[in-house]
């Protein structure tokens, strides 16, 4: 469908950005339309995405009603809907975790690349977790139906949805108001909060003591701080670890330098070592995020919190 006739009819009007709740509603509506493409295995190109967004917002991006970051969020929401609807069946049909990952990769390949970035996404480092990497995080987390899963920097819930299909109870925290609205729509039974995840342990209600935390926090950005804030990752991880239940597991995606032997993070890992053990850490090439608007090298780290009274594990430095 050619969008020009509709766009021409709208160019005389400059549209104000819809209220957050309305934007969330329209993003979910766009995602529902895009879901049909994923269900039938059809790739989503820029033309299809633009038309879908114009239909959902009754306006073009040139009028200011939506930006391309919104469009990419709609695609991501549709992917989450796919996993919520079909993920459990996909897992059942897969003969191995590798085969399940292959299914997820084929689904991910249908989505367009993030070729345009908004000022907010850059400032707040809102670079979404690629769907295949989210599946790997889920495998590392080992979700069970008995778990209470917290995603402190939830975005649209790309990590948490894998806990949901495992039958776990879900708690989601997201600072951005529009994304919180999306989360409430996608995860009807989840507790959704809007705190600064850098101090999640101080802010979240005490009744939530997660057995698993999965997170992809900003690498070097913080609320109310201009420019880079190099302690951002440490603050997010340490606060999440403080909230994690004894014997719980934390799986985190960070910048590549977040490692025990990096001088700037030595004190953070000493603090981690007082209550938990790093059981896995591996660097991830930046090309994994390339389709999502950034090529920064990252790291996947798995941290197991010790049970109350458990001795510190002795490991080689």
Where does each model-flagged region fall?
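Replication-associated primase and helicase/ATPase modules
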Residues: 1-9
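Class I S-adenosyl-L-methionine
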Residues: 11-184
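A conditional alpha-helix N-cap/helix-loop micro-motif detector
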Residues: 130, 194, 230-234
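Conserved proline-anchored active-site loop of SAM-dependent methyltransferases
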Residues: 134-165, 172-173, 194-227, 239-259, ...
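Conserved Class I SAM-dependent methyltransferase catalytic core
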Residues: 137, 175-177, 227-302
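Short, structured coil segments at secondary-structure junctions
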Residues: 166, 186-188, 274
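Conserved beta-strand segments of alpha/beta enzyme cores
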Residues: 169, 189-193, 277-280
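C-terminal lobe and adjacent flexible extensions of AdoMet/dcAdoMet transferase-like proteins
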Residues: 303-307, 317
């Amino acid at each position: 469908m050619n969008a020009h006739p509709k766009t021409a009819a709208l160019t005389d009007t400059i549209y104000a950005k819809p209220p957050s709740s309305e934007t969330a509603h329209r993003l979910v509506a766009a995602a529902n339309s895009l879901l049909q493409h994923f269900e039938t295995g059809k790739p989503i190109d820029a033309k299809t995405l633009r038309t879908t967004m114009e239909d959902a917002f009754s306006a073009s991006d040139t009028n200011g009603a939506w930006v391309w970051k919104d469009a990419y969020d709609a695609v991501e929401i549709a992917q989450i809907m796919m996993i919520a609807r079909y993920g459990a069946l996909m897992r059942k049909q897969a003969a191995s975790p590798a085969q399940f990952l292959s299914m997820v990769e084929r689904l991910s390949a249908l989505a367009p690349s993030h070729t345009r970035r908004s000022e907010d996404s850059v400032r707040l480092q809102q670079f979404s977790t690629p769907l295949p990497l989210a599946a790997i995080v889920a495998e590392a987390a080992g979700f069970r139906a008995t778990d209470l899963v917290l995603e402190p920097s939830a975005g649209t819930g790309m990590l948490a949805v894998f806990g949901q299909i495992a039958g776990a109870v879900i708690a989601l925290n997201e600072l951005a108001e529009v994304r919180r609205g999306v989360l409430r729509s996608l995860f009807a039974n989840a507790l959704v909060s809007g705190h600064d995840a850098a101090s999640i342990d101080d802010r979240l209600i005490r009744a939530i003591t997660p057995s698993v935390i999965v997170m992809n926090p900003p690498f070097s950005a913080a609320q109310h701080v201009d420019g880079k804030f190099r302690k951002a990752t440490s603050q997010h991880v340490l606060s999440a670890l403080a909230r994690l239940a004894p014997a719980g597991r934390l799986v985190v995606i960070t910048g590549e330098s977040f490692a025990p032997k990096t001088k700037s993070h030595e004190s953070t890992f000493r603090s981690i070592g007082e209550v938990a053990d790093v059981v896995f850490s591996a660097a991830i090439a930046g090309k994994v995020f390339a389709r999502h608007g950034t090529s920064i090298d990252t790291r996947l780290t798995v941290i197991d919190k010790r049970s109350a009274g458990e001795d510190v594990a002795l490991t080689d430095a």
